[in-house]
Amino acid sequence: AKDDLKLNDKTLKSLYSIGFTAAHVMPEKGIFKGKSDLVVLNDEMISVAKDVTELIEFKTTGWSDGGYPNSLLGVIAVIRQTLLDADWYQRSSDIFNKYPEDNEPIALNHSLAELARFKSQRLPFLFMTKEEHAALRALKISEEFSLNPWLLSSGYEYRRLDQIKKQ
């Protein structure tokens, strides 16, 4: 994620002048955006912590983009299927490692392996939620897949605070 951050000197000095010395940097594209880093805001952009969170956003591509998915239902399906695939990948890898002579090796998939690692080590999954209903969706998915959820919220979650507390 650090490599995606492009700040000019003026922006860097402006941030530093108002007290910002570090930033939680995140990739911008996709539903499963990737891993975030904590970086020092200076010329070198040194990573203080790598792979802080795995970032997920309920992001549709829209009809004009020609991409998939272009509906919220499709996004939720992609998130659930990807997490199911990561579970399958972890179980299959464990079985192969335990009984290599009885099984064919599975194809290496770094993305699924990283999702499985984050899940098994209870590392945080940061959900970008643009409204309170997305926060509830994120918590429901987190409960279903035993994730450690963090919410980057919209500020309107107080409208559903009782429901959020229950989850």
Q: For the regions a protein language model found, what residue spans apply to each?
A:
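Acidic, glycine-rich catalytic loops of TOPRIM or P-loop NTPase phosphate-binding modules used
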Residues: 150-154
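Acidic (Asp/Glu)-rich catalytic clusters
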Residues: 142, 162-167
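Polyanionic/metal-chelating signatures
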Residues: 16-149
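Alpha-helix initiation/capping motif
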Residues: 6, 71, 109, 160-161
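Short acidic loop-to-helix transition motifs that present clustered carboxylates
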Residues: 132-134, 155-159
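Aromatic/His-enriched, Gly/Pro-containing loop or helix-boundary segments
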Residues: 1-13
